[in-house]
Amino acid sequence: MKTLGVFILLSWLSTSFAFAQQNEQQKDTIQKLDEVTVSAQQILGSKFQARNRTGSAYYISPQEIQKMGYTDINRMLKAVPGVNVYEEDGYGLRPNISLRGTKAERSEKITLMEDGILAAPAPYAAPAAYYFPNAARMQAVEVVKGSSQVQYGPFTTGGAINMVSTAIPTKFSAKLSASSGTNNTLKTHINAGDSKKHFGYMVEYLRYQSDGFKHFENKQNAGFKRNDLIAKFKVNTAKTEGANHSFELKAGYADEDSNETYVGLTQSDFARTPFLRYVGSQKDHLTTRHTQWVGTYLLQFSNRLKFTTHFYYNTFFRNWYKLESVKYGTSANEKRTIGQILADPETNAPYFDILSGKTDSRVFYNDYERLKDNPGLFVRANYRNYFSRGVQTKAEYKAIWGNCYLDNEWGLRYHTDEEDRNQWDDIYAMKNQQMQLLWKGLQGSQANKITRANALAAYWLSKLTYKQLTVTAGLRFEHIELLEKDYTTADTRRTGQKRIETTNVANAVIPSLGLHYNLTDWLSAFAGIHKGFSPPGVSKEKRVMDRNGNITLLTENQKPESSINFEAGLRVNYKQLKTEVIGFYNHYSNMLGSDLAAMGGTGTLEQFNVGEAVVKGAEFIAQYQPFPEESPIKTPLQLSYTFTDTEMKNSFESNSWGRVIAGDEIPYINRHSLNLSIGAEYKKYELNIGIRYNGAVRTEPGQGLIAERHKIPAYTIIDVAAKAHFARRFTLTLNAINLTNRTYLVSRHPSGLRPGHPLGIFGGIIYKVN
């Protein structure tokens, strides 16, 4: 804890210096600090703040979100440079997001937040984001990268994404948004709220459902249904001189009921019928429930000094019941995973024929004790419970003397999260393209363990502005304790007769330095350097305990992910033109990978050391409005481009990536991606067009030309949104995604080829009262 003591000392010295300088000012001098008001739930709050940081940042404003009316976070983020995403289900329900070349799978290497609170089910113990906040109910999305992100952890290599939910309005307002369209896709979004002198409230409900664009030959539904309910209530003192207090309580509930699967298609079937679902996935079903409770206390003495404290408790349950493998004979070696079957359907033809329903599986044993030895389809219940809870607080102090402005921020968070895995396999026979239950598995017979993390995080950030120069220095500290209790599949009741305890402890000091200089009234330059960090998994020390309490120690070594990251860029803000160009270079001394079923691994979620790696690239964005502000015609244009180059420096083998050779690229990272947005606004009418280009992507580690079997070809997708405003309250909307109805491949994982969303057309209404 010596490091934490140094951290506190540095913070105290910066505070003392600021107070001393302020006290030297003349008492009769009236000073005013101009600031952009940012709510306690936001980290940027405006495009102005994003453009004036010493590091890279982007603010997707409410106006931007409303233009295209997206419900898919993948489409929402497409305009942000430095962001890589690859689709999975076509609706953005469980996105795979990478920031500056971090691993994209389940967005597990970014700091994901909702209203400033960690949002992944168990961000330290099991960071894969199987829960992602519903983008359709967000009023803004904030993305910070590079040296801008030292306040936000634990993942500091690529960046952080903060989903900003609907705020309590300053006066009464209500909104109804409803749409319907292709594949019986329906969305209903309602919110209402008000504020009085000493209290305010907001309630919100979102219903989102679809029959899905994939289909079974027997017309079985392949869609989903989602519900989101949010309520906020705030009490506050009058905003007068002296200390002001406010307390806001946020409660949320969300659930999902979907027929989503990990089963994709063979190469030949994708070419013929890209939206087909094999009958072997007819029992695949996902059920989730999520709750959140957040209490936010704000104490503000003045515009210069305020304290914000959050208390939070989140729970998440999910049971993804999905096909795991197929067994053709009675012996154990006559069993193949879905990934193996779809990767080579010719060699595994007997297994594929059962999966696709071309042939029935055989039943050799009818007595109860031998039923589980029969051939058939093994469907795994991926039954998991999560919770995360904690308290985080920050203090902000602003001082001014002469031409110098000093902003100080200190933060502290104590956090606990847990994942409870209790999984089993059921066995089905295939008969006349219908799956019939043969054997009901025992809960806990496939995975039976609890992983818990306790984490203490603290940070200090100081921003000094002198004339045209801004210098930002920061320091973050992370102390993480991990414990896994594996009760083993032999002790499904968790009696404790035998369990394997795995522990790990990680400490990290994460410094950050950023510079921003206004070269002219319209041109500025910035640069930054910071340390990247990602928590390790629980695989350092294993304690095997028998029924007599005897412990056997086994040791392994897993280090945290660590990197040194550089960035430099220029910003132009000239009349109606705003541009930004950035170069970045991330040098990993140790990169971590994960054994995820979503990547075709075994699904243990255990992390492995990749070792040294380099990710470098460039980001560009330009925004232009040809017509002056007072013109009745608006034609906003935006172009963004990202180039990313990755290289792993070590050779190794893993369940997810197989054999990796030094020099291989990281899979599922776009080398080139480009987005163009074109808008036209005149009086009551709006038309917005989004054009997205994704270059070819490699789905397995490799180098040189991409082999066809490991390739996602380049594609261009066009989306269009039109609006007509009638009176002040009523709007008609018409949206089309994938306007040209292009059939395109988005992934070869977890098992087989998966298509992107085909043409979708949706009409709707928006009704507002305010």
Protein language model annotation of sequence segments:
Residues 300, 306-312, 316-320, 324, ...:
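Membrane-embedded beta-barrel scaffold of Gram-negative outer-membrane proteins
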Residues 180-209, 218-261, 285-289, 295-302, ...:
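Transmembrane beta-barrel wall of Gram-negative outer-membrane proteins
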Residues 117-145:
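Short acidic/polar hinge/loop motifs at secondary-structure boundaries
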Residues 74-121:
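Extracytoplasmic beta-strand/coil segments of soluble accessory domains associated
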Residues 35-68, 93-96:
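N-terminal periplasmic "start-of-domain" segments of outer-membrane beta-barrel proteins
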Residues 465, 578, 583-589, 604-701, ...:
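Gram-negative outer-membrane beta-barrel transporters
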Residues 378, 405-520:
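Signature of Gram-negative outer-membrane beta-barrel scaffolds
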